[in-house]
Every structure is written in structure tokens, then in C-alpha cells.
Amino acid sequence: MQINISTRHGDISDATKEKITQKVEKVQRFFERLTSIDVTVDLGKADEPKIEVHVRPEKRDDFVASYQSGDMFGSLDQVLSKLEQQIKKHKEKLQERGKNVSEDV
């Protein structure tokens, strides 16, 4: 799985990129078949950076979440929480489809 981190309107340190990478890698716990994760840090408002994450799984549309607050890592935690909810909901739908198919047979 590939993780891409980009910034708009400024730069972030390598240490910050490493922390973001470590946090984002945890998304794989929820869904194994991921091709890439794109993280965009928008520093347009210096006091409120915006974090946007696109998760690209195999054979499905992207999961996307964003959040803006005064704390960059707090925003990242909120985004990851939103993504976790989206992925769990998707997995539940897949499981329900499987049950319905087996009941019809």
C-alpha cells in the first residue's frame, strides 16, 4: 500500500510526515485491500490546518474524509475516525449481501 502526503500553502517537517504516516497506516486494520492513501494538509489558515484523506481500496469507490481545527493531529484523529465509520459501514453492507445471497439459494 502506498501512502502519499502532500501540503498546500506551506510545508510540514519530516517528523510530522512520519507521525502522519504512522497514524494513517492503522487504517489497514479495518480494510485489508487498500491500494493507496492520499493525505493532503492544507495550511491556508495557519491557525486551523485542514486534513483531507482519500483511501483507495480495490474494486470500490474511494473513502474520503476531511476535518479542520486548530490541532493538526486532532484533525487527523477526527478524519481517521470518520474513515473508520465509513469502512465499517461498507463491510457491514458486504456481509449483509453475502447473507442475503445464501438465503436465496
Where are these regions (language model features)?
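N-terminal, polar/charged subdomain of small-to-medium soluble alpha/beta proteins
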Residues: 1-105
